[in-house]
């Protein structure tokens, strides 16, 4: 058979493109060329004649026109349907060509400033932008950022009022994605100053203004997503796509930014105050989760100024944000009790209920996250805030003079000619392969006189005068003086350190973590959210947040006064024990009614009660008389000793009786096999696993001890009684056998005959070779299944469980207990199944 060339392999379209390109240059029609089916394939396969034509400036300009021009006319097709407009097809093909992985096209565009200016004039269009056009524009420029990073970044930084132009289209998601792509190019190992430049252009403050409660909610939600994305890519981690802490994320937690944000969130008279509150809380939550100081590789408390000078890549400090939000707790409490938007009763299948509302839920969620933040070690340290203030003061001075260590590049330490150079200097290209001055966790190099070179040139980032070598050396000496308390050395330099009075005043303030807990106690935060737990019995999102707060309070280190005070407040003011009992009684009344059902909070109520009981068991010796009266109350004791115990037992009960593994064995066995428990090692192991899962560690050891003794004695005396495991198996098997009716036996026989007939029919159409292969596969499958079927006991794998035995128990135990335990471990490690009593 012969293929007709030109149809199956695309030669026809290729020849058509060649025919168009063979025409005189002034007769080539770009539109006609783009309408050919194979033009994209030819472009991506690097057709030299096609690329030569496409790389011409006038052709590239026309391709850009196809992307930018708007043609909203829709021409109906002949059959009355809708046909894709011609201009839409041309825009798509033009964007695919400009974003194709062809180096010559990318280079021809980026190096032609006229073309780039024309392309970026798209931002000058009046909004709202066409979403399809915006996606094409973003796609092309993201490709340019990937392939020609330095040139594209340099061009973007040359655009006048870039931040204003791009935020003019904040409601267009494709444009915001392009902004995030631009920021993400400023990685730690190849930092090119994008974050610092956007900081100097006022990006964060411009975004923040769009979160005003007087701005349209759709714009607010889009801007909030952009800010959260900036926080995510600025996290202090080594994950792919993360650029690390930077000037933008640091500005987000500054006093000015947080003050403005809290004012927006609490402006109840504004038309869209609820939207501002919801978005503000989501931003704060993202800040806390992405900047947990407990996970910093180098904690700030271990970064003295003389050995770790501040950089823009230092970990983000959340103390200022936490203090400002703690001061606003009274305002948030008013909104929680009386939100700006009240919803009517909502009909459900079980009656009308009062909806919680987004404002209430977000405030409760904010409380939980602020509590998480207050428990960070840095925010619980008395010296943490003062130390961070000194670092921030020095960092601001260095940044203003464009000499912060973030912008320095250092070569290998062993290189005698190693120098520091500014990222924006003319000599940057000569040092672009050198290592960065610090990594993403804020570590900075030792700055010495030999390797210091701070000669800078003009840059778009800052107009400040660069500091000289002597000034920088003075600053470093001042940093050392601050660290060692040398006031004389600090006064001899142009750099003015923080006054000692400011530092002392900061130390006199309550520790930030404790300050939040004090505000919680004074404003009855815990009692309020506990009331909401029972007022909204069907909102499981709220129940989960309340449980999070309770377990944080009760599991915090109680050696700190405010942690213990907050826990006591939960009992005294929050009356958590009384409310748990009340919730249980209310649920019992509902269940007792005809067609009654459990309250929606009962699952969380049980685990909250478990946390309370655990706390009481650990710290009851420190309780005062009022607390003792609460926990010794008759209703509470009855709940703990009866209701809660019954609930635990019910929750731990196997719903289906036997475990699925044992049920499977029972179904596959006939009556004769079922009566002989000792011939069923698989079933024996399944029962052993069940006993282990439902018994204590001591019970498991006792079972193994009896198994080992019975196994050794079976050879000597066949008349011995069965061991406990065999007795349990025989009991279960006899119970199953006794309940099997004649109908069940007939069903088993029918299934057996049906299976035999099916097997015989299948064997008629299979060869002996196939049978052998099938047997091999079955053997392999069984061996694999057995490997997974007999896992080693978790009790013996986890060595920590062995330490649960007290010293007295070890002394009172028999000498053979260790041998028995070793025997059981050896049996498990060898993958054996314990068989006895054949």
Curated annotation (Swiss-Prot):
Biased-composition ranges, Polar residues, are 448-460
Q: Where is the composition biased (Acidic residues)?
A: 690-700, 714-723, 768-779, 806-818
Q: What GO CC annotations are associated with the protein?
A: chromatin; cytosol; nucleoplasm; nucleus; protein serine/threonine phosphatase complex
**Protein species of origin:** Schizosaccharomyces pombe (strain 972 / ATCC 24843)
What are the entry keywords?
Cell cycle, Cell division, Mitosis, Nucleus, Phosphoprotein
Phosphothreonine: modified positions: 419, 493
Phosphoserine: which positions carry it?
411, 418, 425, 459, 468, 491, 494, 711, 713
Q: Oligomeric state and partners?
A: Interacts with ppe1 and mis12.
Family statement: Belongs to the SAPS family.
InterPro entries given for it? Answer: SAPS
Official protein name in the record: Extragenic suppressor of kinetochore protein 1
Biological process GO annotation list?
cell division; negative regulation of kinetochore assembly; regulation of signal transduction; signaling
Q: Where is the composition biased (Basic and acidic residues)?
A: 423-442, 724-734
What coarse category fits the chief subcellular location reported for this protein?
nucleus
Which domain of life does this protein belong to?
Eukaryota
Main function: Has a role in chromosome segregation. May provide a dynamic connection between kinetochore microtubules and kinetochore chromatin.
The listed locations are: Nucleus
Record-linked Pfam families: SAPS
């Amino acid at each position: 058979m012969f293929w007709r060339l030109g149809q199956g392999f695309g030669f026809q379209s290729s020849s058509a493109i060649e025919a168009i390109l063979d025409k005189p240059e002034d007769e080539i029609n770009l539109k006609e060329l783009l309408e050919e089916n194979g033009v994209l394939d030819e472009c991506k396969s690097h057709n030299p004649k096609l690329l030569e034509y496409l790389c011409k400036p006038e052709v590239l300009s026309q391709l850009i026109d196809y992307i930018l021009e708007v043609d909203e006319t829709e021409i109906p097709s002949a059959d009355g349907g809708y046909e894709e407009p011609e201009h839409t097809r041309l825009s798509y093909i033009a964007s695919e060509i400009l974003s194709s992985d062809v180096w010559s096209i990318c280079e021809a565009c980026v190096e032609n400033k006229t073309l780039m200016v024309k392309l970026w004039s798209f931002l000058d269009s009046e909004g709202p932008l066409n979403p399809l056009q915006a996606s094409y524009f973003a796609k092309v420029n993201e490709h340019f950022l990937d392939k020609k990073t330095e040139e594209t970044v340099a061009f973007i930084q040359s655009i006048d009022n870039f931040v204003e132009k791009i935020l003019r289209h904040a409601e267009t998601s494709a444009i915001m994605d392009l902004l995030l792509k631009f920021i993400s190019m400023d990685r730690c190992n190849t930092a090119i100053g994008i974050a610092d430049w956007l900081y100097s252009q006022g990006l964060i403050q411009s975004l923040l203004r769009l979160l005003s409660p007087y701005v349209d909610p759709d714009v607010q939600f889009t801007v909030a997503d952009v800010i959260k994305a900036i926080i995510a890519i600025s996290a202090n981690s080594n994950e792919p796509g993360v650029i690390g802490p930077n000037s933008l994320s640091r500005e987000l937690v500054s006093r000015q930014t947080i003050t403005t944000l809290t004012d927006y969130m609490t402006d109840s008279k504004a038309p869209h105050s609820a939207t501002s509150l919801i978005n503000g809380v989501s931003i704060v939550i993202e800040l806390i989760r992405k900047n947990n100081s407990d996970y910093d590789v180098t904690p700030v408390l271990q970064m003295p100024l003389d050995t770790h000078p501040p950089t823009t890549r230092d970990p983000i400090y959340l103390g200022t944000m936490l203090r400002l939000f703690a001061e606003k707790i009274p305002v948030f409490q008013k909104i929680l009790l009386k939100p700006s938007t009240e919803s009517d009763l909502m009909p459900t299948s079980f009656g009308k209920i009062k909806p919680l509302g987004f404002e209430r839920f977000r405030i409760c969620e904010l409380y939980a996250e602020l509590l998480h933040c207050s428990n960070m070690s840095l925010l619980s340290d008395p010296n943490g805030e003062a130390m961070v203030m000194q670092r921030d003061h020095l960092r601001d001075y260095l940044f203003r003079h464009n000499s912060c260590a973030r912008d320095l590049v250092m070569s290998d330490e062993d290189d005698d000619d190693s120098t520091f150079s500014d990222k924006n200097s003319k000599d940057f290209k000569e040092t672009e392969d050198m290592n960065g001055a610090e990594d993403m966790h804020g570590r900075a190099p030792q700055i010495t006189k030999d390797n210091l070179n701070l000669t800078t040139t003009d840059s778009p980032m800052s107009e400040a005068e660069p500091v000289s070598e002597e000034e920088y050396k003075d600053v470093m000496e001042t940093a050392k003086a601050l660290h060692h308390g040398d006031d004389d050395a600090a006064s001899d330099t142009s750099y003015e350190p923080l006054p000692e009075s400011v530092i002392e005043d900061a130390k006199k303030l309550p520790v930030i973590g404790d300050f939040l807990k004090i505000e919680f106690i004074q404003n009855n935060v815990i009692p309020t959210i506990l009331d909401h737990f029972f007022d909204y019995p069907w909102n499981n999102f709220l129940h989960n947040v309340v449980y999070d707060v309770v377990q944080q309070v009760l599991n915090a280190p109680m050696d700190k006064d405010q942690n213990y005070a907050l826990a006591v407040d939960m009992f005294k003011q929050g009356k958590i024990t009384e409310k748990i009992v009340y919730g249980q009684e209310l649920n019992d009344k509902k269940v007792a009614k005809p067609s009654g059902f459990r309250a929606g909070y009962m699952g969380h109520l049980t685990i909250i009660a478990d946390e309370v009981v655990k706390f009481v068991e650990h710290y009851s010796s420190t309780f005062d008389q009022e607390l003792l009266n609460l926990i010794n109350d008759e209703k509470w004791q009855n709940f703990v000793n009866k209701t809660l115990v019954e609930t635990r037992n019910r929750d731990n009960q196997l719903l289906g009786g036997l475990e699925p593994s044992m049920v499977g064995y029972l179904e596959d066995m006939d009556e004769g096999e079922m009566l002989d428990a000792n011939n069923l090692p698989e079933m024996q192991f399944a029962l052993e696993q069940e006993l282990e899962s439902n018994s204590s560690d001591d019970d498991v050891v006792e079972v193994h001890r009896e198994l080992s003794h019975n196994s050794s004695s079976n050879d000597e005396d066949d008349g011995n009684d069965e061991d406990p495991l065999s007795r349990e198996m025989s009991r279960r098997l006899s119970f199953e056998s006794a309940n099997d009716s004649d109908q069940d036996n007939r069903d088993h026989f029918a299934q057996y005959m049906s299976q035999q007939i099916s097997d015989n029919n299948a064997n008629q159409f299979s060869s002996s070779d196939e049978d052998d292969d099938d047997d091999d596969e079955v053997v392999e499958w069984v061996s694999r299944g057995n490997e997974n079927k007999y896992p080693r006991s978790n009790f013996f794998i986890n060595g920590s469980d062995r330490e649960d035995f007290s010293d007295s128990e070890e002394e009172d135990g028999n000498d053979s207990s260790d041998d028995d335990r070793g025997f059981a471990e050896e049996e498990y490690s060898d993958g054996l199944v314990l068989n006895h009593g054949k």
